[in-house]
Amino acid sequence: MTTNKTFSMVLAMTLNGGIGYQNRLPWKLKEDLQRFKKITTGGIVIMGRKTFESMNSKPLPNRVNVVISKNMKSSNEVQVFPRIEDALQFYNTSHQKLYLIGGKRIFEEGLATDKCSDVHLTRIGVETKCDVYLNKNIFSTFQVNKTSQTKSENGINYDYQHLINKNSHEQSYIDEEHQENQYLDMITKIMKEGVSKDDRTGVGTMSIFGQTMRFNLAQSFPLLTTKKVFFRGVVEELLWFLRGNTNGKLLLDKGVKIWEGNGTREYLDTIGLQHRQEHDLGPVYGFQWRHFGAKYKDCQTDYSNQGVDQVKEIIQLLKNNPDSRRIILSAWNPIDLKQMALPPCHVMSQFFVANGKLSCMMYQRSCDFGLGIPFNIASYALLTYMLAKECNLNLGEFVHVLGDTHIYSNHVEALKKQIERVPYPFPLLKIKGNKSLFDYTYEDFELVGYNAHDKIEMKMAV
């Protein structure tokens, strides 16, 4: 006799397929266990004998407990069947939902029945020690319905994903979607609604105006995963800003080419800076952050104690007057704009403290969604992490306010490829030691659990 009864699967798995270690879960995630309880309570949970034994042979409360075994016998607390198909047939007319909860053999045999309607998957971002693995592509025939925002607990980054078979209408149990979807959805919006515009570079853009994205910094670090982001470049550029540097060669010597195109002899000559030495970028971000109002000469001059050191003032305000509404960092100085190789794109940021949590809101006038924005998100998130550590604050949000929000015409095909990708959990960020904000090096920053799709090549418009 055949059955039309379907079931859901509920499991946690690393990105390489790890699900268990020594007949136990390899991680302790309290929130994930609470979610498991929320999903399965009131239903029928189907498990293998080893999974049942890993629970000290105690049935889960408020659920019908079913064990698949040829050796065990049914009791008042547990129903036993030799095969999954037998359990499905027995509960064919039951109004209760069925959930397969492990282990490996149960998941594999369950998929072989072709009765799995959906999967509630917890994706573990860190490869912890495991001795039981599923094929990491075991759910490749399912569609992603929803992906949650990244969470963290006990040094482990993870998220929830709801996978469905076509025609499934099961509940996802996901309240807040992955925050990288904001970025991907914005690309789609620009492609659908963007106005074609000429621009300074001659490449041309599709543009919209006045958008916002928000990232929760307390749970994870928002380094995009749908393409690999050059994190070392993000760090080195920010440290270069914080030191007040304007010499692009210092970045080039470290293999960071972000500013290379804007510092060449040819480029500087075309914007009227023939007197400037190659890779002297003028009074750009770092100069404005550390010496706002000082007279710029060249990148070799010592500007100590000249102008306003906005970064130091921010640190003092965060420590001594965190409720101030004047904790602002500005890179836009109209007097200096013509001396800059490139006027600031990320113009101003404001810092806000509530309940001991530090948040940052940054306004960006020109927003290159293909190349620039992934860097900008990570850079200001990193700055907020560093300021929070310096001032003994917890982390809040990064709010990104977007002015001219655009895609360059030569990035369209690459971005079409990117928006088809499903994000991985955001990584965690650890800052080692207790150095001054101005003394950190790249080696002081550690990404934990960064998994990303392959890099996508896009040419920078200069």
Curated annotation (Swiss-Prot):
It holds the Pfam family Thymidylat_synt. Substrate binds at V10, D32, I101, T122. NADP(+) binds at residues 12, 18-24, 49-51, 68-71, 102-109. One of its GO terms (biological process) is methylation. Pathway: Cofactor biosynthesis; tetrahydrofolate biosynthesis; 5,6,7,8-tetrahydrofolate from 7,8-dihydrofolate: step 1/1. Keywords: Methyltransferase, Multifunctional enzyme, NADP, Nucleotide biosynthesis, One-carbon metabolism, Oxidoreductase, Transferase. GO terms for molecular function: dihydrofolate reductase activity; thymidylate synthase activity. It comes from the Eukaryota. Bifunctional enzyme. Involved in de novo dTMP biosynthesis. Key enzyme in folate metabolism. Catalyzes an essential reaction for de novo glycine and purine synthesis, DNA precursor synthesis, and for the conversion of dUMP to dTMP. HAMAP family: Thymidy_synth_bact (MF_00008). This is Bifunctional dihydrofolate reductase-thymidylate synthase.
